[in-house]
């Protein structure tokens, strides 16, 4: 089964992606990982990509698509794969379609922006140990202090409210057209159209996981 899993920062996509891959025995593949692996292995596509990157240019969709084809030919993709961060644009989605790279499912884990902002902006971290807290969902015993050392907790820059809002806006700008594209395609009844679902991303990890499994098995 080939799956595209989409979700805003803080929607819990990473947790669910790991579970899907383990359950279906498929690899999670990203364009970044594919690029690094191809460059390191000095494949023809990797050599071409390295020339482009060394020149300070963006890797073209043509090269990205060649990497995807190369990766899908690997033995561990025989049962399918889960795409992480690809496609990012309608042009890339169209390229997949035109090259007859079939997809089984496109799924978005949907969480309202307000909920994501609360999730992320409430995080606090004890830097030296990596212990994490949340001001609402998992507060420390003493406000602002690590439970074990009593040292101050910090809010990472990525978790500051304005930063979260900017990241969400970028996600919506990039992904909304892509979601609409796959949603509309799924309704055409075309035999090569993937199924499409928007999964409610609130509740426990197990509840969200069950919604995903129910959708995949429907």
UniProtKB/Swiss-Prot annotation:
Entry keywords, A to Z: ATP-binding, Cytoplasm, Kinase, Nucleotide biosynthesis, Nucleotide-binding, Transferase
Region: NMP, residue numbers: 30-59
GO molecular function, one term: ATP binding
Catalytic activity: AMP + ATP = 2 ADP
Residues annotated to bind AMP: 31, 36, 57-59, 85-88, 92, 156, 167
Region feature (LID): 122-159
Listed PANTHER family: NUCLEOTIDE KINASE (PTHR23359)
Full protein name: Adenylate kinase
Taxonomic source organism: Chlorobium phaeobacteroides (strain DSM 266 / SMG 266 / 2430)
Gene: adk
């Amino acid at each position: 089964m080939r799956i595209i899993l989409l979700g805003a920062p803080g929607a819990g996509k990473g947790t669910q992606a790991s579970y899907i891959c383990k359950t279906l025995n498929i690899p999670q593949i990203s364009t970044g990982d594919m690029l690094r692996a191809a460059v390191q292995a000095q494949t023809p596509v990797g050599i071409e990509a390295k020339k482009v990157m060394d020149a300070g240019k963006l890797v073209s969709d043509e090269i990205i698509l060649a990497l995807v084809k190369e990766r899908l030919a690997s033995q561990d993709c025989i049962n399918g794969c889960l795409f992480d961060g690809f496609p990012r644009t309608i042009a890339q989605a169209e390229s997949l379609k035109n090259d007859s790279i079939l997809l089984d499912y496109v799924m978005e884990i949907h969480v309202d922006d307000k909920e994501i902002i609360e999730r992320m902006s409430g995080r606090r971290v004890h830097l030296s140990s990596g212990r994490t807290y949340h001001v609402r969902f998992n507060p420390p015993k003493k406000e602002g202090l690590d439970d074990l050392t009593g040292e101050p907790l910090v809010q990472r820059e990525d978790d500051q409210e304005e930063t979260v809002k900017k990241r969400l806006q970028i996600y919506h700008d990039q992904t909304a057209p892509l979601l609409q594209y796959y949603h509309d395609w799924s309704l055409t009844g075309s035999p090569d159209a993937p199924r499409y679902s928007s999964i409610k991303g609130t509740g426990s990890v197990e509840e969200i996981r069950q919604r995903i499994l129910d959708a995949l098995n429907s």
